[in-house]
């Protein structure tokens, strides 16, 4: 018998913009909430997502290639952070000893402005976890604090097999620390870059190398957003980009599963398809 002792509203919206025969690619936005007191458009990043998709009509095709800044939206940052944790700090890669972070507990693995806390009882997390999958009471813990690797995200089984500490939480509600730089200032200081609203690519390699298409994205040139861009490829390395952080935004988005800011990373290769 399975019983559920919590309840929430889960909202998922898919949409695209249309004007005449022109249309954008589909984009998805979603969040979890306990209350229906506020209009959906005021929650999470839905209003900005709708506006961004509207502004992605008639995109320009990127030509050539440059190495520059990648600005990740909060949703895309969460996606990248999930890949980082999966690639370097999760059960499988720690057990089979393929993680490049396996021997780096207590060492610096990221810029000191990066702090990632797993907190299932944070006030922004809707219906968080009270017990782990193994039956332990949950607790918050830091994965990365001020750039230093503090913990892996391990089950009891892998903890017993490897000797590393078990994670105090089975789920992964990440609270990513905000910075003190307004997003507008981050954009204004970007000479050549891309704001990535969605990433479409394969699984990163063991080393953290990634490559894929930047979807629902905007080109930044000379400190200004110059328009939507299509057929842009981005590539880099997950481990290296954490150390190539340029800025963390003051603004954050809470989607009911965690909190994330915008982050800008240098040294990313951006090229036309």
Residue ranges and their predicted role:
Residues 103-273:
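Dual-mode signal for accessory low-complexity, basic/Gly-rich regions
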Residues 1-129, 136, 145-146, 224, ...:
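Active-site bordering "gate/hinge" segments
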């Amino acid at each position: 018998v399975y019983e559920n002792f919590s309840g929430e509203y889960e909202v998922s919206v898919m949409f695209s913009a249309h004007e005449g025969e022109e249309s954008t690619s589909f984009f998805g936005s979603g969040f979890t909430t306990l209350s229906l007191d506020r209009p959906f458009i005021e929650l999470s990043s839905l209003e900005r997502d709708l506006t961004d998709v509207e502004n992605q009509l008639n995109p320009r095709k990127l030509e050539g290639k440059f190495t520059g800044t990648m600005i990740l939206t909060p949703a895309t940052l969460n996606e990248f952070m999930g890949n980082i944790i999966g690639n370097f700090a999760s059960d499988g890669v720690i057990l089979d000893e393929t993680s490049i972070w396996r021997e780096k507990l207590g060492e610096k693995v990221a810029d000191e402005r990066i702090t990632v806390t797993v907190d299932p009882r944070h006030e922004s997390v809707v219906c968080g976890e009270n017990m782990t999958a193994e039956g332990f009471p949950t607790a918050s813990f830091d994965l990365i604090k001020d750039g230093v690797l503090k913990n892996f995200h391990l089950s009891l089984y892998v903890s017993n097999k490897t000797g590393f500490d078990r994670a105090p939480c089975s789920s992964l509600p990440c609270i990513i620390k905000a910075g003190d730089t307004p997003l507008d200032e981050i954009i204004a200081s970007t000479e050549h870059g891309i704001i990535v609203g969605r990433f479409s690519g394969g699984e990163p390699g063991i080393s953290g190398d990634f490559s894929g298409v930047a979807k629902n994205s905007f080109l930044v040139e000379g400190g200004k957003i110059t328009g939507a861009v299509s057929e842009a490829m981005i590539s880099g390395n997950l481990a290296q980009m954490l150390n190539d952080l340029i800025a963390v935004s003051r603004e954050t988005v809470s989607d009911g599963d965690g909190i994330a800011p915008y982050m800008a990373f240098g040294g990313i290769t951006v090229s036309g398809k």
